């Protein structure tokens, strides 16, 4: 059951926080809205606030319209559209902004990714950085995606929050993909 998994995760995060004295980010995601969107955000807001009262913040992740899992893909219909911004702001939910997911959503739904970043700037708590192309090409090396993505990546580099490089298979070959991403991100940052 999902709530039992969430309870165990929060308990573990709390133990890590007590051990380290620092906050432990817990990033989660949702898949499909089975009821109406307002009810979805009300229910999830209440759930996340309950865990926050126990000292652990769970931050929902911005999702792609088509998510790839080992073995296939699934269409997602929440936390990936411009209309979700209003709900996130109204319910004061923090967000893990996954840049490659945002790019895929921009390409699928035809919205301005920069506008979403601007509208959620006070709620972005955590950022995942990777490039993307088309509607389902996620986790690409920085610079290997759609050319207009570099401006979006530049925009988020100055946000004061935890950032994680999330290039697909970046850990292989002694972290070659992560190293390449760090070098490219440093070039982008220094060129501003």
Model-identified regions with their sequence ranges:
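Active-site acidic/histidine proton-transfer and metal-coordination neighborhood
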Residues: 1-94, 104
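Histidine-acidic metal/acid-base catalytic patches
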Residues: 3, 7-22, 46-47, 90-192
